[in-house]
UniProtKB/Swiss-Prot annotation:
The gene is G6PDH. This is Glucose-6-phosphate 1-dehydrogenase, cytoplasmic isoform. Its EC number is 1.1.1.49. It is found in: Cytoplasm. The active site is at H270. One of its GO terms (cellular component) is cytosol. Catalyzes the rate-limiting step of the oxidative pentose-phosphate pathway, which represents a route for the dissimilation of carbohydrates besides glycolysis. The main function of this enzyme is to generate NADPH for reductive biosyntheses. Homotetramer. Transmembrane segments: none annotated. NADP(+) 1 binds at G36, A37, S38, G39, D40, L41, A42, K43, R71, Y151, K178.
Length: 511
């Protein structure tokens, strides 16, 4: 009875309003609610990320409790059993896995059910009462491992029944996964529906690419190293490629993928976010709003995408998937040129390339510099200088440059200065993107999350092209699985000014 009375008393005092992050306490009871807890995203990404944060000491068992919520009617132990197989295990951490799983409680309910969310709030409040026997705040983090179609109803339920009620302070935050709409209109509609219920500082639009180690390194590389500052502009850089390649197809996700295609799935969000970090001006400080302000300026400086600077492809066999329509016009491959109309980047093509069922798996940024004027060594035919940042697999960065070939003759050869993370940082475990981003959410750091005006500007760039594709005005070119993609894409790169170094392959240093 005492616990029940205290929960009711706590509920009588509401504290939903946003306050400056610098003044919000980050200690006290923490409730992490995984909505869609029985789904693949939660099992494969969210819960493993939470476990890794727990085992590294970022989630303290005396403060945190994790709640799974979904429509599936299962018990606490059923959910724990489903999750266990996805957590890194070995004899050395069996105990940690068991301890972590005991922090998880499951609540079943629909996503528009007042009864379900009332039960969820009761479970959270009981946890908060038990943890807050001494003075402390209560923090509620809702992670949406859900399709966007249910975001509005879930947000209404949270706002009505599950907001932080502690009279000791704290916060309520929501983490929402992409896709954030299919075009400008649907994205704005979704943003408005969520924005009516939560303030912008309470909304964390997650793009897991912003949590990758070398993506997070971009601003440090650009603004903490003196020699990059005078080179990073149109006077020295000829073109920039941002590439995402997969060597497998849709693999059972054909029906889902066909609704979106490679541009919506990869280019409009992941690769565009990388482009912003590559192209933005130096922010006033490291504060999230200063960084995001500069990213928005880049997006607002972009010119409309021209059809003649776009090549689309669809791998042969894509429509063999029974969930894909026979008349599908959805691209599984795209190469396009984006152009920024500002003083730093006028005339420099940003080449975005993404595709499935290609000949390799990698993601990288390739900055190609201009030819050396007055080439007295006649070495430009060997290739241009390039700075390459390998995002995955095997994180690395290297500078491709021309040196004298060892020997008695004055001849040149291409070589590289490189930094392989696997070699340089042996024994250092590079965190998964979801670990970083969930920790950022708990800390109230929105630097690596997408702001509403940033999202709007991104959709303004791509919506006209996407509508032309949806209407069948732009057709994908068939290409063979395991190839480089359509030959027309290589022609587009050449026309944009990219000079390929034939026969040169960077070999990562061995351990």
């Amino acid at each position: 009875m005492a616990a029940s009375w205290c929960i009711e008393k706590r509920g009588s005092i509401r504290n939903d309003s946003f306050r400056d992050n610098d003044n919000i306490p980050e200690t006290g009871c923490l409730s992490i609610i995984v909505l869609g807890a029985s789904g693949d995203l939660a099992k494969k990404k969210t819960f493993p990320a939470l476990f890794n944060l727990y085992r590294q000491g970022f989630l303290q068992s005396n403060e945190v409790h994790i709640f799974g919520y979904a429509r599936t009617k299962i018990s606490d132990d059923d959910l724990r059993s489903r999750i266990r197989g996805y957590l890194s295990q070995g004899k050395e951490n069996e105990g940690e896995v068991s301890e972590f799983l005991q922090l998880i409680k499951y609540v079943s309910g629909s996503y528009d059910s007042a009864e379900g969310f009332t039960s969820l709030d009761k479970a959270i409040s009981e946890h908060e009462f038990s943890k807050n026997s001494t003075e402390g705040s209560s923090r509620r983090l809702f992670y949406f491992a859900l399709p966007p179609s249910v975001y509005p109803s879930v947000c209404r339920m949270i706002k009505s029944y599950c907001m932080n009620k502690s009279d000791l302070g704290g916060w309520t935050r929501t983490v929402v996964e992409k896709p954030f709409g299919k075009d400008l209109a649907s994205s704005e509609q979704l943003s408005s529906q969520i924005g009516e219920l939560f303030d912008e500082p309470q909304i964390y639009r997650i793009d897991h690419y912003l949590g990758k180690e070398l993506v997070q390194n971009l601003l440090v590389l650009r603004f903490a190293n003196r020699f990059f500052l005078p080179l990073w502009n149109r006077d020295n850089i000829d073109n920039i490629q941002i590439v995402f390649r997969e060597d497998f197809g849709t693999e059972g996700r054909g029906g889902y993928f066909d609704e979106y295609g490679i541009i919506r799935d990869i280019i409009q969000n992941h690769l565009l976010q990388v482009l912003c970090l590559v192209a933005m001006e130096k922010p006033v400080s490291q504060k999230p709003e200063h960084i995001r302000d500069e990213k928005v300026k880049v997006l607002q400086s972009m010119l409309p995408i021209e059809d003649e600077e776009v090549v689309l492809g669809q791998y042969e066999g894509y429509k063999d998937d029974p969930t894909v329509p026979n008349n599908s016009n959805t691209p599984t491959f795209a190469t396009m040129v984006l152009r920024i109309h500002n003083e730093r980047w006028e005339g420099v093509p940003f080449i975005m390339k993404a595709g499935k069922a290609l000949n390799s798996r990698k993601a990288e940024i390739r900055v190609q510099f201009k030819d050396v004027p007055g080439d007295i060594f006649r070495c430009q035919k060997q290739g241009r200088n390039e700075f390459v940042i390998r995002l995955q697999p095997s994180e690395a960065m290297y500078m491709k440059l021309t040196v004298k070939k060892p020997g008695l003759e004055m001849s040149t050869v291409q070589s590289e200065l490189d930094l392989s993370y696997g070699q340089r940082y042996q024994g250092v475990v590079i965190p998964e993107a979801y670990e970083r981003l969930i920790l950022d959410t708990i800390r109230g750091d929105q630097q690596h999350f997408v702001r509403r005006d940033e999202l709007k500007a991104a959709w303004e760039i791509f919506t006209p092209l996407l509508h032309r594709i949806d209407n069948g005005e732009v057709k994908p070119i068939p290409y063979k699985p395991g190839s480089r993609g359509p030959a027309e894409a290589d022609e587009l790169l050449q026309n944009a000014g990219y000079v390929q170094t034939h026969g040169y392959i960077w070999i990562p240093p061995t351990l």
